[in-house]
From Swiss-Prot:
Function: Participates in the control of cell fate choice by uncommitted neuroectodermal cells in the embryo. Transcriptional repressor. Binds DNA on N-box motifs: 5'-CACNAG-3'.
Name of a matching Pfam family: Hairy_orange
Gene Ontology molecular function terms on file: DNA-binding transcription repressor activity, RNA polymerase II-specific; protein heterodimerization activity; protein homodimerization activity; RNA polymerase II cis-regulatory region sequence-specific DNA binding; sequence-specific DNA binding
Subunit text: Transcription repression requires formation of a complex with a corepressor protein (Groucho). Forms homodimers.
The protein, known as: Enhancer of split m5 protein
């Protein structure tokens, strides 16, 4: 008689095969990618921070240090607020006034009266600019007027002829020292 063989073959389903072989392999690959990214992040933060102490930290400490570093960078980027054009102009005007004052003080033939007159004039003009800027700011914050009578919806031909007959004063332009 022939030896009896166990004809029962074990069938492995795809799910069982996945759980046994593929899942651990995919998990190792995922962890390898994460570790590679963490190492790259660690070197980048150490490079930008200029501190090699982060290279000796464990993963959790390194991630915390990276978060702190990124938050500092965001705060630094938000801090510099561009100055308003008028503020920039005021700063330039004051620099020009101080330069004029320095030059006049160093000029031996310059009389004191002329220097006082020039500096007084520059101060008066600066005050006038500040007042004009305050008026302009209050006008822009109030309700905007229509650009023309026609755009308001209450336009008549009589208003047009009256406004052409009476000339309006032209607004003075802002004096600039250059």
């Amino acid at each position: 008689m022939a030896p009896q063989s166990n004809n029962s073959t074990t069938f492995v389903s795809k799910t069982q095969h996945y759980l046994k072989v593929k899942k651990p392999l995919l998990e190792r690959q995922r962890r390898a990618r994460m570790n590679k990214c963490l190492d790259t992040l660690k070197t980048l933060v150490a490079e930008f921070q200029g501190d090699d102490a982060i290279l000796r930290m464990d993963k959790a400490e390194m991630l915390e240090a990276a978060l702190v570093f990124m938050r500092k960078q965001v705060v630094k980027q938000q801090a510099p607020v561009s100055p308003l054009p008028m503020d920039s102009f005021k700063n330039g005007y004051m620099n020009a006034v101080s330069e004029i004052s320095r030059v006049m003080a160093c000029t031996p033939a310059m009389s004191v009266d002329v220097g006082k007159t020039v500096m007084t004039h520059l101060g008066v003009e600066f005050q006038r600019m500040l007042q004009a800027d305050q008026v302009q700011t209050s006008v822009t914050t109030s309700t905007p007027r229509p650009l023309s009578p026609a755009s308001s919806g209450y336009h008549s031909d009589n208003e047009d002829s009256q406004s052409a007959a009476s000339p309006k004063p032209v607004e003075e332009t802002m004096w600039r020292p250059w």
